[in-house]
Structures are given as C-alpha cells and as structure tokens.
C-alpha cells in the first residue's frame, strides 16, 4: 500500500517519506481493516513529527512510524470477533496517538473505535471530524466536576474558537446545549465567519484578552484551546484573570507528556501526574485565586462517534474544511497546515 513514513523526529519535512510498497496490515480478533478514502492533519500530528511525546511513543512503536489520527473509509476485511460491522460499511474512526496512524491507504482499528460515518457527509468531510470532536466531547461532558455541569446560563469563553477543537466546542455549546452567552477569542479575520454561523455572542481578538475587574463581566468557564506553545504561561494567566473566582479552566495540553519528554517516562510520568493533580493548588498559590483547572484529552470511542454522527445527520453540526491534498503531496499539506492559521481542517485524500 501507499503511505507516509516518519523516519525521524525534527523540523525538516524531508523526514516524511512517501512509500508505495508498504504491507497492508491484517485485522485480528476485534479489528477491522479500513480502506481509507480520506484522512487529515491534526495539531498533534505536526508536533509529534517534531518529537512531541516521542518518549511515550517509543515504548510501543519504533521509527519509522505513520502519523495521522483519524480517517473515513470503507471496511474491506474484519477480524474473527467482529459482530457489529461488516464488509462494505462506510465508517469513520479516530485511533490512539500511540498506534500506527492513518496517513496511508489501509489501517486496522478495533471495532470499539469506529462507527458508521454520517450519511449526509462525504468521506472528506467526515475525515475532518473524529479526533477534534472526541477531544471536545470529553472536555464538555467528562472533565467538569458534577456540580459544575454546563447549563444554558453558564457564561463561557472558548479561547481559540477558530481551531478544530474550539470550533467543535462552539458548535456543541450553541447548537446542542443552547448556551445563552458564549464568547471566543480568535484571529480577527475569523470574526465574521463565526458570527455568521451564529456560534458566538462575542468575538475577542486573541491578542487582546482583557476583562475588567468587575466579577460580573468574567466567565464561569473557559476552554483554553491555546494552552500550548511558547506563550503557554502568559496565555494561562490571561484566562485566569478572565475567570470568576471559583470558575473552571479546561486545558488540552497537560503536563504528563511534557515531563515525560523532558525527564524520561520512568521519572517524568509520575512528576507530570503530580503536577496535574496539584494544578488547582498551584494556581491558588501563584495567582491568589480559586480556580479549578482540569485537562481534557482525546479518548477513542466508537459509541461517542455514533452520537456525534447523529448530530451531523440532523444538521445540528457542520464540518469545517480548509484545503485538500493527495497523499503524495504530504509535505505541501504540512506546509499549508503550519501557515493556514486554522481556516479549517487540512484533508489528505487517497486515489485508488
């Protein structure tokens, strides 16, 4: 099969190699083999190719590896223990970060990680959704404390609403949960698009997130989709300043991987876990403010994808695509991704 091998970690796109003679994987037990029509590039793919999470990836996989976390395609073979799907089913999937990915023509995934794709979406549209939607779903429904669940009157800010996760969160909040007051920060050029889609009540330039000292103007909950990168600490402070005392902050770039990459898995993971468990206490000491900080992560789930599929089929949610490339244009696709400033997902298509 055709596929893209990552031969080493680093900035250079020359570390990505287009191959035409890779073996087609064989599904075992509860796995299915998907003929991939379309896949995508996620922010995680872009940082993983540069070495992010390599300390953990190396425990399960050895270079070269295949990146890509989501796909849409057709089941062409099933394992002996698969009962809920059959050959010919049109499905979508998002697989764990530490497994071989979808930047190729065929992939094996467990049947628990797939569902039938939305009937009203193309494979290209469907491939833009699973990874970000499952991350966002986890943040909204599984991370918040039970006494802080979102209501229609919760005042919410999505910091980074033009990114793939942020865009999905905005849609869920306004179109599914009917939250009355939703604000977002993003690049100025995305203001009109988000307003036209009626996904926000207020748009804020992400370079100018300033809330006055009146607690009534502050937010009950902030989803911090900008919590990575070199300005992470400054960004965290802006979010905390914008929260009411007793508010909730949900990030997406927890300390587990950072500590593991820095200090190795054996010492880094325990340190990262302690740091994450003590995040709220750290904020209280550092900023003299009572804010509850949690981190949301991607978690593969076919049952959740099934729920999300219904939201698309009922026209409650819409896909968001920027540009499309063929698999052999992978270097151009990554270049576009790094320069796109989140106009939508970058899609990679296979031609059979």
Swiss-Prot record:
Catalyzed reactions: a quinone + NADH + H(+) = a quinol + NAD(+); a quinone + NADPH + H(+) = a quinol + NADP(+)
Subcellular localization: Mitochondrion matrix
Gene Ontology molecular function terms on file: oxidoreductase activity
Coarse class of the protein's main subcellular location: mitochondrion
EC number assigned by the record: 1.6.5.2
GO cellular component terms attached to this protein's record: mitochondrial matrix
Domain Enoyl reductase (ER), chain residue ranges per copy: 11-348
SUPFAM superfamilies (alphabetical): GroES-like, NAD(P)-binding Rossmann-fold domains
Pathway(s) annotated for this protein in UniProt: Cofactor biosynthesis; ubiquinone biosynthesis
Residues that bind NADPH: 165, 206, 296, 298
Top enzyme class: oxidoreductase
Keywords noted in UniProt: Mitochondrion, NADP, Nucleotide-binding, Oxidoreductase, Transit peptide, Ubiquinone biosynthesis
Keyword Transit peptide recorded: yes
Disulfide bonds: none
A Pfam match: ADH_N
NADP is among the record's keywords: yes
Functional summary from the UniProt entry: NAD(P)H oxidoreductase involved in the ubiquinone biosynthetic pathway. Required for the O-methyltransferase activity of coq3.
Record family assignment: Belongs to the zinc-containing alcohol dehydrogenase family. Quinone oxidoreductase subfamily.
Protein name as it appears in the record: NAD(P)H oxidoreductase RTN4IP1, mitochondrial
Native source species: Dictyostelium discoideum (Social amoeba)
Gene this protein is translated from: rtn4ip1
């Amino acid at each position: 099969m055709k596929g893209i091998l990552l031969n080493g970690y680093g900035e250079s796109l020359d570390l990505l190699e287009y191959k035409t003679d890779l073996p087609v994987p064989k599904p075992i037990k509860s796995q299915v083999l998907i003929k991939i029509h379309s896949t995508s590039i996620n922010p995680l793919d872009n940082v993983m190719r540069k070495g992010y999470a390599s300390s953990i990836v190396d425990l399960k996989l050895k270079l070269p590896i295949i990146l890509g976390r989501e796909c849409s395609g057709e089941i062409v073979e099933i394992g002996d223990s698969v009962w809920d799907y059959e050959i010919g089913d049109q499905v979508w999937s998002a697989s764990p970060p530490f497994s071989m990915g979808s930047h190729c023509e065929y992939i094996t995934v467990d049947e628990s990680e797939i569902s039938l794709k939305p009937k009203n979406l193309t494979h290209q549209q469907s491939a833009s959704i699973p990874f970000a939607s499952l991350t966002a779903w986890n943040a909204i429904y599984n991370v918040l404390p039970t006494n802080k669940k979102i209501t229609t009157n919760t005042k919410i800010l999505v910091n980074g609403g033009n990114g793939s996760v942020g865009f999905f969160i905005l849609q869920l909040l306004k179109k599914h949960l009917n939250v009355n007051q939703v604000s977002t920060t993003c690049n100025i050029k995305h203001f009109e698009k988000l307003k036209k889609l009626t996904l926000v009540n207020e748009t804020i330039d992400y370079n100018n997130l300033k809330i006055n000292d009146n607690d009534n103007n502050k937010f009950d909950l902030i989803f911090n989709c900008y919590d990575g990168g070199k300005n992470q600490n400054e960004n965290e402070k802006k979010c905390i300043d914008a929260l009411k005392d007793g508010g909730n902050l949900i990030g997406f770039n927890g300390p587990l991987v950072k500590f593991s990459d820095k200090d190795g898995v054996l010492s880094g993971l325990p340190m990262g876990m302690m740091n994450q468990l003590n995040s709220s206490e750290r904020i209280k000491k550092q900023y003299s403010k009572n804010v509850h900080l949690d981190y949301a992560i991607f978690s593969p789930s076919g049952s959740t994808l099934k729920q999300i599929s219904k939201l698309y089929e009922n026209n409650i949610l819409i896909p968001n695509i920027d540009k499309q490339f063929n698999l052999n244009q992978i270097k151009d696709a990554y270049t576009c991704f790094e320069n796109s400033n989140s106009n939508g997902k970058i899609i990679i298509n296979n031609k059979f």
